[in-house]
Amino acid sequence: MCIRDRFLAVPTQNLASFCKENKSFLTDRPLIACCKGVDQATGLRPSEILSEHSSKIAVMSGPSFAVDISKGMPTALVLASAEPGFLRKLQSDISMHNFRLYRTSDVVGVELGGALKNIIAIACGIAIGAKQGDSARAALMTRGFSEMVAFAQAHGAKEKTLTGLSGLGDLSLTCNSEKSRNFVFGVSLGCQKPFNKNTTVEGVATAFAVSQKARSLGLEMPITSSVSALVEGSASIEEVINSLLSRPTKEE
């Protein structure tokens, strides 16, 4: 790994300001985004924000918790970049025995998989917190994944990417673990208990940004819209549950 490579694990909502404040440190350097989200103010993905500072950009995402990686536990992630040579070198330099990296050119798919699963994790947490049961969680994960695929494909992503580590893999981990900040935040919402406001919950801002974009594209994303409405306080848990359960049945 070259010392010139910059790995950015800054929360997505702070990435633009961080880059502006550290412009001299980042300009024309290889940049690797490790954050998962969509900027609420601009609707931009991390790679789009970084593209203003460098032409050599990659994103790294997938099912992982920092604490597991720090302990050397087996982890598999995905690296994505539009630069094949840069991508292969990164994969070779970073991969280790317990840290496997796969590669793809589908930057959009990798980024949106990592961003959108946070919204669904909040929804699953709400279901568990509101004591709706594991069957409800499974339904939210499955239908939520359909929303993820539809939104990502509308932005040019490949369905194959969403069924891989950065999409389905990350969704499975985040919706089923109390290590997930987004899931735990959802649980707090569901049981109406306070949540540590100093904790980063990327899914909140992402839900707002994605809901707005989905409306402009004419995409139906009821789970995402419900999370957005709940977080902004325009709907109650009871109203959201009733709304989702009263949707017309259709072919899967």
Language-model segments: residues:
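Internal alpha-helical scaffold of NAD(P)-dependent oxidoreductase catalytic cores
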Residues: 14, 25, 49-57, 74-161
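Nucleotide/phosphate-binding catalytic cleft detector across ATP-hydrolyzing
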Residues: 1
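Glycine-rich beta-alpha junction loops
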Residues: 36-38, 61-67, 83, 105-110, ...
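NAD(P)-dependent Rossmann-like dehydrogenase/reductase catalytic/cofactor-binding core
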Residues: 124-128, 153-163, 169-252
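General beta-strand structural signal in soluble alpha/beta enzymes
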Residues: 33, 56-61, 101-105, 164, ...
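Conserved active-site and cofactor/substrate-binding residues in soluble primary-metabolism enzymes
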Residues: 10-13, 17, 41, 45, ...
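Rossmann-like NAD(P)(H) cofactor-binding subdomain of soluble oxidoreductases
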Residues: 4-74, 90-92
